[in-house]
């Protein structure tokens, strides 16, 4: 008996540390095994968010008023004392045996108590196929960056599936309504239905389980998720389907929006909040959401988002009140989180909702703020008396490219303090359409709430670079100052959405500029400066070999330099064609194609820049070959045609989510450009009809010119249906490849 008791006691002693462990212990252990023993973590009550760095003997003390702020303090210490930068490209590090001491206590406070993360688009453009391992890293990243209020939209297709089954909808009806994995974001935003599906049952069970894990970890950290709410979405065939199923919801055409298109896709219907059936639907939605995922303090709803199908004479005040009332019925303490985007929020919403019941996300604060700073979306009264968050959008379509508005971001952030609306500024947010790019911009944004005094980008970049690489180097600093001054400093006069898009990813023409339809791109930096920065990085690459952050940045900066050089060569090639300079034309277009293949070769060295990482993530979520094929098709379509022929061409969605990645460069973009240049070559050689560029008979020119009648979609679709596997991990000697590629691209 005594032996049994001793054994039980010994077992409990072994298990006790895991029972007593805090989420901070788990975070530190995931960063580096044994790291939790190197810190003293102290939680102190405070009415204001803060973290402190201190020293006690040989151990570093990190103090804060909650786990998230303590994690933010750990991140600050790692960057500015230990020279360790945890980033999307590297969330693990080897800490020194003895941590560098904090010689003087350092304290940071913020009045921005809410720090938001994500855009609905992020859940499809970046996170569509993430598993728990990747989500665990992201939640750690959020905590380290002070995020305490993220959108948590995983698994909401499960809520809708259950609602429709309760209402008696058939499996086909459900499949026709709910979108596939790579397109769920736009279904949730009421833009399309069914595209990318049907989802197998295993998808729903996986997503439900994944969301529950995500929410559990967030709760451990004290992170409060923003869950999707209900604002009236119903299937576009709602009236017909309601007549076919057995339920007590009456049909009335007057309160259903007319069927509209979104870039060629049929939008779901909108059950107007003034309709009595709205309450029945919203009740079911919140019941099912709470049953699956629990009650939330915040719900995200964007009624009439990019919508033109609002019935004339609709009482918008009543609509907004009904949406808010439905949420409050589910949780009287809940707050509505709404995006400030385009025409939203409408004046009727500002008037209808009581201050304190809604939080607006100023989605594009660094470029198009609504709170008073000069912009095309400026509102004289901002968000009136409502609370709001200053947000960084930064990325569209998860496109690849160096980009930022450093001066504008810093200026706009500190400018808010001088506006009357600042009294209602309660938070900040990251609202990118796609993540895992330009880590420097998100690091800057997440530090702003913790820095009282305004600073210059030059001084901040100097500290960032030293922290990111764990060492100071004159040439590396010079490279980053060039980038900060040029490509990372898009000016206020420029209204473009996201990075300077790679010419490689454009559908070929004689007037290519941007790859996607709506980027509003315009030149704002000297394109030769990225090569200058790349040259400096390459010159010290041997010194930093094996440094994960440096190697990622080396590839990214050189990638940008090659893309910029290719644009210069493209312009030369077009000029050659227009002047019928056969010799130079052939030489220049071959140089363009050579640069494209060099880019493909370079990007093969890093997993983050390989299309196989994306397609393999998709396939790994499948439990059968049919599921793997469906998910791979979703992944391939999203980054190329986006939709069917009509949506890609007439709807202009093609290449919106283009990716400058290894694999797709060689197998998708190269054939497009090779085809185009060869057609022009036939014209310049007199083997095909051509009319002078700028001929007055433009209609005839378009009809007769084979370069303008290429069926691009017919070339593109086969790649989306293909199943040729791509490698997901980086291959080869990165530093040697970078040096070789730079020499081949720039000749010195």
Describe each region flagged by the PLM.
Residues 661-748:
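Extended, compositionally biased alpha-helical segments that mediate assembly or anchoring
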Residues 7-17:
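Bacterial N-terminal signal peptides
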Residues 520-544, 555-578:
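C-terminal substrate/ligand-recognition segments
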Residues 112-131, 142:
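Active-site-adjacent substrate/metal-binding segments within catalytic domains
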Residues 19-112:
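Contiguous, structured surface segment used for ligand recognition
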Residues 1-4:
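Positively charged n-region of N-terminal signal peptides that target proteins for export
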């Amino acid at each position: 008996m005594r032996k049994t008791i001793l054994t039980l006691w010994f077992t409990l002693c072994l298990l006790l540390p895991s029972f007593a462990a805090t989420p901070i212990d788990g975070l530190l252990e995931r960063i580096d095994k044994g790291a939790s023993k190197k810190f003293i973590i102290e939680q102190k009550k405070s009415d204001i968010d803060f973290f402190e760095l201190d020293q006690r003997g040989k151990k570093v003390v990190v103090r804060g008023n909650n786990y998230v702020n303590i994690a933010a303090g750990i991140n600050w210490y790692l960057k500015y004392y230990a020279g360790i930068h945890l980033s999307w490209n590297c969330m693990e590090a080897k800490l020194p045996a003895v941590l560098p001491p904090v010689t003087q206590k350092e304290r940071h406070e913020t009045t921005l108590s809410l720090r938001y993360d994500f855009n609905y688009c992020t859940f499809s453009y970046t996170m569509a196929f993430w598993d728990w391992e990747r989500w665990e890293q992201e939640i750690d990243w959020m905590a380290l960056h002070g995020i305490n209020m993220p959108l948590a939209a995983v698994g909401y297709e499960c809520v809708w599936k259950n609602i429709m089954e309760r209402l008696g909808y058939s499996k086909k009806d459900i499949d026709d309504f709910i979108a596939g994995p790579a397109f769920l974001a736009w279904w949730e935003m009421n833009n399309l239905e069914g595209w990318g599906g049907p989802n197998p049952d295993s998808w729903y069970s996986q997503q439900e389980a994944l969301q529950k894990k995500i929410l559990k970890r967030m709760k451990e950290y004290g992170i409060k998720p923003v869950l999707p709410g209900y604002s009236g979405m119903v299937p576009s065939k709602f009236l017909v389907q309601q007549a076919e199923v057995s339920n007590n919801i009456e049909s009335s055409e007057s309160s259903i929006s007319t069927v509209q298109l979104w870039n060629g896709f049929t939008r779901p219907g909108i059950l107007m909040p003034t309709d009595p059936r709205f309450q029945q639907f919203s009740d079911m939605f919140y019941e099912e959401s709470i049953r699956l995922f629990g009650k939330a303090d915040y719900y995200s709803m964007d009624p009439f988002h990019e919508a033109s199908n609002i019935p004339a004479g609709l009482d918008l005040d009543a609509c907004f009140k009904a949406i808010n009332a439905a949420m409050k019925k589910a949780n009287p303490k809940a707050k509505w989180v709404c995006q400030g985007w385009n025409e939203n929020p409408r004046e009727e919403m500002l008037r209808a909702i009581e201050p304190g019941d809604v939080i607006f996300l100023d989605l594009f604060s660094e470029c198009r703020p609504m709170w008073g700073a000069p912009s095309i979306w400026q509102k004289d009264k901002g968000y009136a008396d409502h609370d709001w968050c200053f947000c960084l959008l930064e990325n569209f379509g998860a496109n690849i490219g160096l980009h930022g508005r450093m001066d504008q971001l810093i200026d706009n952030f500190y400018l808010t303090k001088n506006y009357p609306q600042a009294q209602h500024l309660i938070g900040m947010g990251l609202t990118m359409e796609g993540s895992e790019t330009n880590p420097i911009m998100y690091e800057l944004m997440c530090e702003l709430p913790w820095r009282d005094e305004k600073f210059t980008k030059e001084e901040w970049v100097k500290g960032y670079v030293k922290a990111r690489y764990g060492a100071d180097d004159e040439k590396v600093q010079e490279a980053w100052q060039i980038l900060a001054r040029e490509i990372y400093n898009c000016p206020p006069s420029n209204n473009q959405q996201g990075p300077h898009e790679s010419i490689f990813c454009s559908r070929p023409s004689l007037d290519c500029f941007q790859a996607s339809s709506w980027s509003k791109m315009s030149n704002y930096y000297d394109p030769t400066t990225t090569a200058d920065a790349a040259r400096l990085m390459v010159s010290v690459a041997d010194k930093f070999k094996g440094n994960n952050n440096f190697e990622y940045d080396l590839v990214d900066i050189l990638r940008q330099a090659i893309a910029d050089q290719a644009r210069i060569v493209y312009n030369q090639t077009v000029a050659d064609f227009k002047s019928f300079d056969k010799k130079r034309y052939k030489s220049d277009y071959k140089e363009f194609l050579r640069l494209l293949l060099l880019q493909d070769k370079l990007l093969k060295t890093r997993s983050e820049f390989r299309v196989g990482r994306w397609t393999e993530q998709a396939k790994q979520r499948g439990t059968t070959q049919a599921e793997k094929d469906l998910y791979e098709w979703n992944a391939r379509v999203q980054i190329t045609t986006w939709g069917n022929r009509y949506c890609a061409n007439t709807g202009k969605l093609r290449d919106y989510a283009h990716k400058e990645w290894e694999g797709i460069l060689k197998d998708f973009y190269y054939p497009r450009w090779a085809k185009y240049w060869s057609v022009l070559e036939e014209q310049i050689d007199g083997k095909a009809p051509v009319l002078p560029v700028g001929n007055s008979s433009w209609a005839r020119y378009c009809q007769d010119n084979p370069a303008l009648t290429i069926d691009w979609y017919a070339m593109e679709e086969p790649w989306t249906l293909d199943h040729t596997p791509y490698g997901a991990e980086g291959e080869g000697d990165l530093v040697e490849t970078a040096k070789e590629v730079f020499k081949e691209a720039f000749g010195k």
